[in-house]
């Protein structure tokens, strides 16, 4: 083999090393830091990424866990109606909502959120608030894995127990006690709508707040729930 050809091969080899080494490092990092999603089928999380971020910021965290069968069906209906009407029919991603978001973006309209309950759960449990491309890839992969590993009821139980329902307040059990002085299992339809309405803005929207926007959100959820009798069979 001539010197010229050997030199060319060496250069190709060097380029390959330069290109592949970062890829290998990223792959190793992803593999080593990847959570055991399937474990959530048999055990509850001890903390979440969002809770740890709040603690890092010096925020107080009040959090308690309530099993699925001890959570009022009114809360389950209100949260599904407010956050993800297609929860029981999609595989983690609501393609219909994504199409609407894409259409509105093209038209220059205000873009609404299109995250499903499963996506929100993945973000709450494992991801930072960052919107980097790598984080979005991790979110998509984790969302898919959650849907493959857990039942819809378990996904909803996890979400209701890790979501933020107000300042320093995590989980529906903590929210029920703080705002209404009752266990999560006896929350009424009206109380459930008030809790669900604050999920998009937990720092500023929660029971007891005087806000036109919050009151309108509560009313919208109550209207949706009144037209969702079919949810009773799935919850």
Where are these regions (language model features)?
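Juxtamembrane regions of bacterial inner-membrane/periplasmic proteins
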Residues: 2-235
